[in-house]
């Protein structure tokens, strides 16, 4: 299994200078993949990133970002959001990422109550609004369910399978699975054939393995369903105001951000 790390462990938003400083260290520690968030188009140059990663033997994964104002359901910003997602696919093609991963349905933090019929209508609208995005590229859209505090639309694998068009894949993130799924390994098996990307962290969003999560069962289920993509550490720094507020990171989650990555990598290699 290829192992990766998201640049959010250290910084946000990503810039060309940040990537030039981080990527050699990530490669030196032994990661296979570096995960690149596209917060705003133009934050970093994908062609420049592609050359840098190729020189270091690193692969890329790309994550989409859904701040307030990016929505595909019950919103007047659907067209702009579709344009943004298509841009993320173009970026992914340039850097060689097979997926764009993230909650491609609603702004993170946007929650509202829905009756069963209202939820069904929201899912139908989502399917319709994702079609032109999925049709845009061979890059696979990997949609991520989030926990109940960050969205009310897609919290579980079961909901995602109901809501999403067949051609959309899933991103599974241990942080959210641990909150919303009664049995994360069973959720993996339920998602068999649809899992396009996996993000990992400790259950406190810190270092993988320094928690009580049943890692052997989870990784065993991924093997059982023949998941072939990477496991990418996604965590966040408390030292960046934007990201600390967005992800509710109010204190350091490891002795250092480097330790979070290096110790997490060492643990993941044991699985």
Question: Which residues does each PLM region occupy?
Answer:
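Histidine-acidic metal/acid-base catalytic patches
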Residues: 1-7, 11-27, 54, 96-98, ...
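Active-site-proximal loop/turn and secondary-structure-junction residues that shape catalytic pockets
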Residues: 9-11, 38-40, 66-69, 104-108, ...
């Amino acid at each position: 299994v290829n192992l990766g790390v998201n640049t959010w462990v250290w910084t946000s938003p990503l810039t060309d200078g940040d990537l030039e400083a981080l990527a050699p260290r990530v490669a030196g520690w032994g990661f296979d993949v570096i995960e690149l968030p596209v917060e705003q188009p133009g934050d970093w140059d994908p062609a420049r990133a592609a050359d840098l990663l190729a020189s270091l033997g690193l692969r890329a994964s790309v994550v989409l970002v859904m701040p307030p104002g990016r929505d595909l359901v019950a919103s007047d910003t659907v067209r702009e959001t579709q344009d943004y997602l298509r841009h993320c696919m173009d970026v992914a093609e340039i850097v060689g990422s097979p997926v764009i991963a993230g909650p491609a349905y609603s702004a993170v933090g946007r929650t509202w109550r829905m009756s069963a019929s209202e939820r069904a209508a929201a899912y139908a609208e989502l399917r319709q609004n994702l079609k032109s995005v999925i049709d845009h590229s061979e890059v696979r859209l990997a949609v991520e369910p989030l926990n109940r505090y960050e969205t009310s639309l897609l919290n579980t694998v079961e909901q995602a399978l109901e809501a999403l068009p067949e051609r959309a894949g899933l991103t599974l993130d241990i942080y959210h699975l641990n909150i919303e799924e009664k049995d994360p390994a069973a959720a993996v098996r339920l998602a068999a054939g649809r899992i396009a990307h996996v993000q990992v962290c400790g259950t406190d969003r810190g270092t993988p393995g320094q928690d009580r999560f049943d890692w052997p069962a989870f990784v065993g289920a991924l093997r059982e369903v023949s998941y072939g993509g990477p496991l990418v550490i996604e965590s966040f720094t408390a030292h960046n105001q934007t990201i600390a507020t967005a992800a509710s990171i109010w204190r350091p989650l490891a002795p250092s951000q480097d330790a979070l990555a290096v110790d997490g990598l060492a643990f993941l290699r044991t699985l």
